[in-house]
Amino acid sequence: MVCVPCFIIPVLLFLWHRFIQPYVLRFWNPWEKKDKDGNVIKDGSSTEFPFQCKGGVCPFPVKDKAKQEVAASGSGSNGTATAVGSEGEAEETKKSQ
């Protein structure tokens, strides 16, 4: 049989997180940035995507071109798993030498 605190505490935490906390955070949210008058500062850049590709060029290209080529060729049912498996085997052979 389960002890009473082991059953009651998770139920209370669920009720807090699901029903009570959203109402409390509407009126008291310590993580919101406020100015000296107490008004909430809304940062418009937080909702935008931080990386933009302009003129067809992305500043952050894909790191591993081998994975991209395997995915583009469409060989195998899961190209990522195949690429990871072959890389792991190559690393193991290097370590054993």
UniProtKB/Swiss-Prot annotation:
Region entry Disordered, spans: 69-97
Superkingdom to which the source organism belongs: Eukaryota
A Pfam cross-reference name: DUF4512
Family from the record: Belongs to the UPF0729 family.
Composition-biased stretches (Polar residues): 74-83
UniProt protein name: UPF0729 protein AAEL015238
Coiled coil regions, renumbered to chain: none
